[in-house]
């Protein structure tokens, strides 16, 4: 008895903004055509982010790879045609148009690790880096500009060097109190 071919991960390009619908449609097509044995997971890797809008903290999801859907599958003519027949699928990424290349196990591991890390705590929608200019929009230092010195994503706080009366003064601020300058 021969061993079943191994399912590999492929990257499918979808219309931007329709990744979720493409993933759902693909799952439905797989069931409809009884091809569950050729397919594994179909996913759109996302992370939960927090943004401040109008003084309110809002959670939303941000896609790691906008415009792409990851599909675990055995590549053959039937599975290739099934994926290509799904509405809003533009094609596969990597390899040639008729012989797509799977992504490496190393890349898959990196994506899976990133997904596991994300599950713990939502990240801010805006990421800050040391040396970056920011504008304080709340608190006693509102309307002052400053330079980010340290970023603490665990506590969602920044240490910003604000210029007060010509002197740089380090100030601890919450992510919600600053915006990129």
UniProtKB/Swiss-Prot annotation:
Stretches assigned to coiled coil: none
Cited CDD domains: KOW_NusG, NGN_Bact_1
GO biological process, one term: DNA-templated transcription termination
Domain KOW: 130-161
Gene Ontology cellular component list: cytosol; transcription elongation factor complex
Pfam families associated with the record: KOW, NusG
Keywords: Ribosome biogenesis, Transcription, Transcription antitermination, Transcription regulation, Transcription termination
PROSITE patterns in the cross-refs: NUSG (PS01014)
Notes on the domains: The N-terminal domain interacts with RNAP and the C-terminal domain binds either to Rho or to RpsJ (NusE). These domains are separated by a flexible linker.
Family, similarity comment: Belongs to the NusG family.
Functional note: Part of the processive rRNA transcription and antitermination complex (rrnTAC). The complex forms an RNA-chaperone ring around the RNA exit tunnel of RNA polymerase (RNAP). It supports rapid transcription and antitermination of rRNA operons, cotranscriptional rRNA folding, and annealing of distal rRNA regions to allow correct ribosome biogenesis. Participates in transcription elongation, termination and antitermination. In the absence of Rho, increases the rate of transcription elongation by the RNAP, probably by partially suppressing pausing.
Cross-referenced NCBIfam families: nusG
Subunit structure: Monomer. Interacts with the transcription termination factor Rho and with RNAP. One NusG monomer forms a stable complex with a Rho hexamer. Binds directly, but weakly, to the core enzyme of RNAP. Also interacts with RpsJ (NusE). The rRNA transcription and antitermination complex (rrnTAC) consists of RNAP, NusA, NusB, NusE (rpsJ), NusG, SubB, ribosomal protein S4, DNA and precursor rRNA; S4 is more flexible than other subunits.
Name of the molecule in the record: Transcription termination/antitermination protein NusG
Organism: Escherichia coli (strain K12)
Lineage, highest ranks first: Bacteria, Pseudomonadati, Pseudomonadota, Gammaproteobacteria, Enterobacterales
